[in-house]
Amino acid sequence: MATGPRYKVAFRRRREGKTDYHQRLKLIVSRKPRLVVRRTSSQVIAQILVTRPEGDKVLAAATSAELAKTFGYKGSGKNTSAAYLTGLLIGYKAQEAGVEEAILDMGLRENRAGSRVYAALKGAVDSGLEVPCSEDVFPSDDRIRGEHIAGNTASKYTQYEKNGLKAADLPAHFDEVKGKITSQYGAK
């Protein structure tokens, strides 16, 4: 390991691979609320944050687990459909909190068009939240509705059947849950 007066130790969160401080500084300097989208091994998490000197403050939050509890979503909490619905939900919650515009904070995720992060972003944009982005990065509407899953009858979708949903019925179920979210939040 390098030693001596010229050696500089990186910040702890950078060493742990959790924070890109160069990117974070650019996001903070914009003085806009951040739409933070993170995905775990089982769900998608979206938050609207503002930066304060004492730390980040959460204005609104939504998870794909909330979709199952509140709106009866039976699909996987980590697929593209769940990411879109989570983005739609966070967009409506942000508007209830008085946030009209935000910027996307992807964290250390690789920037890949059509990913679940961009599906959540499309949901937020469709709810009316203004986020600067290009339409080219969004996944296709067929993929967001889950038609790629409905067309595949592989045995890897048995979890849907355990939840009482056939993989072929996912697009219709997606539209049903989207309608519930829109009727609860969008009609105001």
From Swiss-Prot:
Q: Which CDD domains match?
A: Ribosomal_L18_L5e
Against Pfam families, the record matches this protein to:
Ribosomal_L5e (PF17144)
GO CC entries: cytosolic large ribosomal subunit
- KW Ribonucleoprotein (keyword) present: yes
What biological-process terms (Gene Ontology) are attached? ribosomal large subunit assembly; translation
| Domain of life where this protein originates | Archaea
Q: What range does the record give for the signal peptide?
A: none
Secreted: is it a keyword of this entry? no
MF terms from GO for this chain are: 5S rRNA binding; structural constituent of ribosome
Q: Which UniProt keywords apply?
A: Ribonucleoprotein, Ribosomal protein, RNA-binding, rRNA-binding
The record's InterPro entries line, in alphabetical order, gives: Rbsml_uL18_euk (IPR005485)
- Subunit description: Part of the 50S ribosomal subunit. Contacts the 5S and 23S rRNAs.
Q: Name the job this protein performs.
A: This is one of the proteins that bind and probably mediate the attachment of the 5S RNA into the large ribosomal subunit, where it forms part of the central protuberance.
Q: Which NCBIfam families match?
A: PRK08569.1
Listed HAMAP family: Ribosomal_uL18_A
Q: Record's family?
A: Belongs to the universal ribosomal protein uL18 family.
Q: What is this protein called?
A: Large ribosomal subunit protein uL18
